[in-house]
Amino acid sequence: MDIPFILGAYASHPTPELEADYYQLLADQPWVSGVEIPYPGQLVTQADVLAAHLAPHWDFNTITAIPGTMQHVWKDATFGLASPDEEGRQAALAFTRALCDDLDDLCDKAGRLLVGRVQLHSAPTRLADAEAFKRSLEEVVGWDWSGATLVVEHCDKYIPEQKPEKGFLSLESEIDIVAEVGIGIHLNWGRSAVEGRDAETAYQHVLEAGVRGVLDGVVFSGAGPEETQYGYAWIDGHLPAQADEPTSLMDAEQIGRCAQAALAGGAEYLGAKVCVPKDASLAKRLAMLEGIYRACHLQG
């Protein structure tokens, strides 16, 4: 099936001196349609380098605002597009405007439109308010996004008795909001699994967004109940698939059923984003990502 497949390559970056070789290796793979770009990251600090890494035939790159969003939330608990605190919401709108402007600059440097989707989030932790988020999205959706479409990436919802990784709005609330605003939902398998503490939650989230007609994309990152080299139990840390990390709940069967459910639910793209052992070769990094792609059963 001809559907874009993106890679969160930044999670599996090698050392800086091997970065260009890694991107070239990814560009040589016919099944790779683009990469997920973390914001701010290289988009702010090394836009020229980033533009050079993006292969000319990659026509479906994405940007995620989650790194910068969380950096702000850790400093200011009221920061977020869903903040009930107006100063916190305005600060998040200013951050989002900067992202929009930096995307425009990146496209100028590359001489073409580069990005298909921009992922926004319903921060802040614990305090997120649905009406505030809706107001923010209604404003930003009208901006010029250099050819990109906005999506809301669901992260684990706030559950009082559970230590949050992100602790944002529920998927149900986000679905209602994006349906009104006219944009879609982006799911990350691991973030949904972290919320429910099981693999089934990820599958149910795919079904829920699909049934409501707002599922836009699904990216596969793992999660699990044990401490690993990638972090503590239930970290939102992009664990590899079970074939490469035995404690990960994301096995080939889970990937396959969620990918097929996503396609049936109208998803426009799929992807993979996993961390890797620090000493992994470039070939091993690629193999870990390609294993997820193969498990989606998109070929033929």
Predicted regions and their residues:
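Acidic-and-aromatic substrate-binding clefts and catalytic sites of carbohydrate-active enzymes
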Residues: 11-19, 36-50, 126-129, 158-168, ...
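Structural preference for beta-strand elements that scaffold enzyme active sites
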Residues: 2-11, 32-36, 60-62, 115-119, ...
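C-terminal extensions of enzymes
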Residues: 264-300
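N-terminal pre-domain/capping segments
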Residues: 1-98, 188, 299
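Active-site acidic/histidine proton-transfer and metal-coordination neighborhood
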Residues: 77-182, 284-296
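Acidic (Asp/Glu)-rich catalytic clusters
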Residues: 20-31, 44-68, 101-113, 140-146, ...
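A short, acidic, amphipathic alpha-helical segment used as a generic capping/interface helix at domain edges
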Residues: 201-210, 241-266
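Acidic/histidine-rich catalytic cores of soluble enzymes
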Residues: 140-232
